[in-house]
Amino acid sequence: MSRRNDSSENLTCSFCGKSQDEVKKLIAGPTVYICDECIELCNDIIAEESKLEEAMGPDVKKLPKPREIKDVLDEYVIGQDRAKKILAVAVYNHYKRIESMGKPSDVEMQKSNILLLGPTGSGKTLLAQTLARILRVPFAMADATNLTEAGYVGEDVENIILNLLQAADYDVERAQKGIIYIDEIDKIARKSDSPSITRDVSGEGVQQALLKIIEGTVASVPPKGGRKHPQQEFLKVDTSNILFICGGAFAGLDNIIQQRIGVKTLGFGADVKSKVEKKAGELLTDVTPEDLLKFGFIPEFIGRLPVLATLHELDEAAMVQILKEPKSALVKQYQKLFEMEHVKLKFTDGSLVAIAREALKRKTGARGLRSILENAMLDIMYEIPSQTMVKEVVISEDVIYNREKPIIVYESVAESA
């Protein structure tokens, strides 16, 4: 409602008492009025309370149950049901453990850090990001291949904590209840089974450096990033309650498991009678700490990641589902973009299968879907904003396979009239 009223009555805000002449806007309810200044004040109070709730971290009473966590994960990640159940239970127990720490107990609960094993593009990073979003906690990512021991050229492991602190807007309390995802963790495996005489600054040395922050230590972090120097004051961050999720493809681990359990993979010369045939991805579900030890991880590092979750390689059907079903599905995103131009975008079933098959050829998992779509959609997305009378665009499999132009349906003269 406008702040002015044609009647001679001078209206006032029911909350602060200011008249309509003293404020910019006066909004009417059934029997009350509220001014723009009071609305702004209410918004500030609500925002402040939200910040306070976030600073306290997830409340166990409000913490989603494992089933509820998995239900939300299902909206964003297709398949991988067992991995999602493992993650949901581990995360729920982690934050219950934090809540119980202030209470007297004769049982000491250890932190349940997680190791995710699965091929590239199977959803490891997306699972970790979605978990942080569900729980409303700060989230940071790091690439293990960039990490080196302190004193060597490369990224110091304590920079991971700095990234989390930045995600929490330098709120130490919030950061201490956050989630850190370390990708490509398999790349810091020791290069051989025997301890190296020479310094392995990007392998075993990094494992040793990560041990401290993963198990729980008080890390000294520069307040605004940058290099450490003696005169600098540091922020102290306790990592005891930070949940660490480490992920990797672990190429070659299936061979180690195969040797241990005596299973032959599919191929010429496989003994069908005495051996059970399994694909590489299926073998990873049988992984044990001993297999990871042989792969090149030190026993202490394996011990700090007690929860193991395996993700399977995505097949064609899963790829098609990923394209159209999740909340952030690429098909839905492109349809929304076209909708903004008042154009309907349709993908034929054949086109979705074609995109999935092309992605499988690239062996990059779901990660390859976007680049295939971007390439196929470039020309039509360039043209559509400049065209009028376009009603519908249809993407067929020929657009994907043969780079043909999409089918464009125009409005009839009668419709436009």
UniProtKB/Swiss-Prot annotation:
- Keywords carried by this UniProt record: ATP-binding, Chaperone, Metal-binding, Nucleotide-binding, Zinc
Q: Which residues bind Zn(2+)?
A: 13, 16, 35, 38
Limits of the ClpX-type ZB domain: 1-54
Q: Does the keyword Metal-binding apply?
A: yes
Q: Name one Pfam family in it.
A: zf-C4_ClpX
Q: Which SMART domains match?
A: AAA (SM00382), ClpB_D2-small (SM01086), zf-C4_ClpX (SM00994)
By its UniProt entry, which PROSITE patterns does this protein fall under? CLPX_ZB
Gene Ontology terms: biological process: cell division; proteolysis involved in protein catabolic process
Identify the GO cellular component terms for this protein: HslUV protease complex
One GO term in the molecular function aspect is: ATP binding
Specify which residues bind ATP according to the UniProt entry for this protein. Answer: 119-126
Name the PANTHER family on file.
Answer: ATP-DEPENDENT CLP PROTEASE ATP-BINDING SUBUNIT CLPX-LIKE, MITOCHONDRIAL, ATP-DEPENDENT CLP PROTEASE ATP-BINDING SUBUNIT CLPX-LIKE, MITOCHONDRIAL-RELATED
Q: Which family does it belong to?
A: Belongs to the ClpX chaperone family.
Q: Which NCBIfam families match?
A: clpX, PRK05342.1
- Name the job this protein performs: ATP-dependent specificity component of the Clp protease. It directs the protease to specific substrates. Can perform chaperone functions in the absence of ClpP.
Q: Which HAMAP family match?
A: ClpX
Q: How does it assemble?
A: Component of the ClpX-ClpP complex. Forms a hexameric ring that, in the presence of ATP, binds to fourteen ClpP subunits assembled into a disk-like structure with a central cavity, resembling the structure of eukaryotic proteasomes.
Q: What name has this protein been given in UniProt? A: ATP-dependent Clp protease ATP-binding subunit ClpX
| Species annotation | Geobacter metallireducens (strain ATCC 53774 / DSM 7210 / GS-15)
The opening ranks of the lineage are: Bacteria, Pseudomonadati, Thermodesulfobacteriota, Desulfuromonadia, Geobacterales
